[in-house]
Regions:
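Short, charged/small-residue-rich alpha-helical element at the C-terminal edge
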Residues: 140-167
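Short acidic-hydrophobic catalytic motif
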Residues: 132-136
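ABC transporter nucleotide-binding domains
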Residues: 1-102, 107-121, 125-127
Length: 167
């Protein structure tokens, strides 16, 4: 997320509101959604990374978009920040009316925030559906490509992992 560190959150949001031609009264609404109301008049340079992430989301929410796209929204956050971001994202469809699209490489992280998933590989949609459908269709294993498959399988088996070498 970007913002002017020497300005407050409210000042940063005022700039974005002007750029988006959004009424400034929308600033209070988005600050409340992202739980930054009490810190709105602090300089952004004093914010934690999680607070900066939430400010970035507030900027995106100005003007009430129908779709919000977040790329790795929990990346770099500490455990408390991750939990806070998960909760915020999970509540956003109800609090904002927006559809939230999240890009992430961490399926475990996604499972804690969403009810529908889409899996892309090299630009091709491989799966789209509910988490339950994904779990039902998963193979329950992973395919590894290694230089020495028999040696890798033996090492995994020594660690108690079920492994097989395809013929």
């Amino acid at each position: 997320p970007s913002g002017y560190l020497h300005l407050t959150a409210r000042e940063n949001l005022s700039i974005v509101a002007d750029l988006k031609d959004v009424e400034r009264k929308d600033i209070s609404r988005v600050l409340e959604i992202v739980h930054l109301t009490k810190d709105a008049d602090r300089k952004v340079g004093q914010y934690s990374l999680g607070m900066k992430q939430r400010l970035g989301i507030a900027m995106a929410l100005l003007g009430s978009p129908k779709l919000l796209i977040l790329d790795e929204p929990t990346n770099g956050l500490d455990p408390a920040g991750i939990q806070e971001m998960r909760s915020l994202i999970a509540s956003m469809p109800q609090t904002t009316g927006a559809t939230v699209l999240i890009s992430s490489h961490l399926l475990g992280e996604i499972e804690q925030m969403v009810d529908q998933v889409g899996i892309l590989n090299h630009g091709k949609l491989l799966f789209e559906g509910s988490l339950q459908q994904l779990q039902k269709h998963s193979r329950g294993g992973i395919l590894l490509r290694v230089l020495d498959a028999p040696k890798a399988a033996a090492a995994l088996q020594q660690q108690g992992v079920k492994a097989a070498v395809p013929a």
